[in-house]
Design a protein with these regions (language model features):
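Helicase P-loop NTPase motor core
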Residues: 1-61, 66-70
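Positions that flank functional sites
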Residues: 67, 145-146
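Short, charged/polar "capping" segments at the starts of alpha-helices
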Residues: 44-47, 146-150
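Conserved motor-coupling elements within RecA-like helicase/translocase cores
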Residues: 65-76, 80-84
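Short, glycine/charged-enriched secondary-structure capping and boundary segments
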Residues: 50-54, 106-108, 153-155
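Conserved helicase C-terminal RecA-like lobe
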Residues: 31-34, 78-143, 149-151
């Protein structure tokens, strides 16, 4: 990323997080298709897609095993795994909440402390990769307890 440092934005509820994303996306105008909303899981992405579409925001899913149509209109929606290797003008990493980042299920599968540390490192790298997909702007959105991994992308 070559722009400003990541901006952490905290919201009291999911609805207010969605409202911020909707306003942000609409404010981008013609550049909306150069921005991407990134989530840790497909389930969270589905929840945002439904809420954004209800708010009148055009969206475009960047799907696994499919090339992105760069001329299709709409805010890009993708999981952290899917954005590897891609770049966008702007990124909003949504739902960067404890339990989602790191993904609690991923940590629960660890059989011992060493495996848990490795799972935490994988999650931290995934967040870092997502944050570095932006050329100009990264927003990290929280609507709950913040992820303990946030210092990995925004500093202490």
């Amino acid at each position: 990323m070559h722009g400003e440092p990541p901006e952490v934005r905290r919201f009291p509820s999911f609805a207010e997080e969605v409202a911020w994303v909707a306003n942000w996306a609409k404010g981008l105008g013609a550049e909306m298709s150069e921005a991407c909303l990134v989530t840790r899981t497909q389930a969270v992405l589905d929840r945002f897609a439904e809420a954004l579409n209800a708010a009148g925001v055009a969206t475009y899913r960047v799907r696994r095993n499919e090339a992105e149509d760069r001329v299709a209109p709409g805010l890009r929606l993708a999981t952290m795994h899917r954005v590897k290797g891609l770049t966008f003008g702007r990124i909003a990493i949504a739902d960067a909440n404890r339990g989602i980042l790191p993904l609690e299920a991923s940590l629960a599968e660890a059989a011992d402390p060493a495996s848990r540390r490795e799972a935490e490192h994988r999650e931290r790298r995934l967040l870092f990769v997502a944050a570095t997909r932006a050329r100009r702007e990264v927003n990290v959105l929280v609507s709950g307890d913040p992820s303990p991994l946030l210092p990995a992308v925004v500093g202490p």
